[in-house]
UniProtKB/Swiss-Prot annotation:
Top-level taxon of the source organism: Bacteria
One record GO biological process: lipid A biosynthetic process
GO molecular function: (3R)-hydroxyacyl-[acyl-carrier-protein] dehydratase activity
EC primary class: lyase
Species this chain originates from: Prochlorococcus marinus (strain SARG / CCMP1375 / SS120)
Family: Belongs to the thioester dehydratase family. FabZ subfamily.
EC assignment: 4.2.1.59
Keywords assigned: Cytoplasm, Lipid A biosynthesis, Lipid biosynthesis, Lipid metabolism, Lyase
Full protein name: 3-hydroxyacyl-[acyl-carrier-protein] dehydratase FabZ
NCBIfam families linked to this entry: fabZ, PRK00006.1
CDD domains: FabZ
Lineage: Bacteria, Bacillati, Cyanobacteriota, Cyanophyceae, Synechococcales
Protein task: Involved in unsaturated fatty acids biosynthesis. Catalyzes the dehydration of short chain beta-hydroxyacyl-ACPs and long chain saturated and unsaturated beta-hydroxyacyl-ACPs.
Active site, per annotation: H57
Length: 151
């Protein structure tokens, strides 16, 4: 983790890979620009035409699938849940979504700025995070994401 006394903690792609199990083509967070372990995180996803889903979604009018926007939000949220002190070590998996709304399309060339904040932890096994994804300051997706510890 890179930081100085006056700057927020940031994570490089390599550091993210040390915390999350996702790998290409499903690693959807390029870097983290703000990170308070166990509390909040802001990540960036650079959307490029080279991503495999754009071949069929949709030819001639490529749009990032909404489920992948939600997954990118979940990966940023996973960074928060993964670093909560005193939680058992193990694999936290995406377990559910509530109140997800899509506001505008995301296209190649966009940069998603994803902000997530911890809402709650229950029984040291279940986490809930509030997430928002924006492009150029405009909200494109928001919702609540749930995580569960897998034995």
């Amino acid at each position: 983790m890179t930081n100085s006394p006056s700057s927020p903690v940031v994570l490089t792609n390599e550091e993210i890979m040390g915390l999350l199990p996702h790998r290409y083509p499903f690693a959807l967070v390029d870097r983290v620009v703000e990170y308070e372990p166990g509390k909040s995180a802001t990540g960036i996803k650079n959307v490029t035409i080279n991503e495999p889903h754009f071949q069929g979604h949709f030819p001639g009018r490529p749009l990032m699938p909404g489920v992948l926007i939600v997954e990118a939000m979940a990966q940023v949220g996973g960074l928060i849940v993964k670093q909560i002190p005193d939680l058992p070590k193990g694999l936290f998996v995406f377990a559910g979504i509530d109140s997800v709304r899509f506001r505008r399309p995301v296209v190649p060339g966009d940069q998603l700025l994803i902000n997530c904040e911890l809402i709650s932890i229950k029984r040291q096994r279940f986490g809930k995070v509030k997430g928002e994804a924006k492009v150029d300051g405009n909200l494109v997706c928001s919702g609540e994401l749930m995580f569960s510890l897998v034995d």
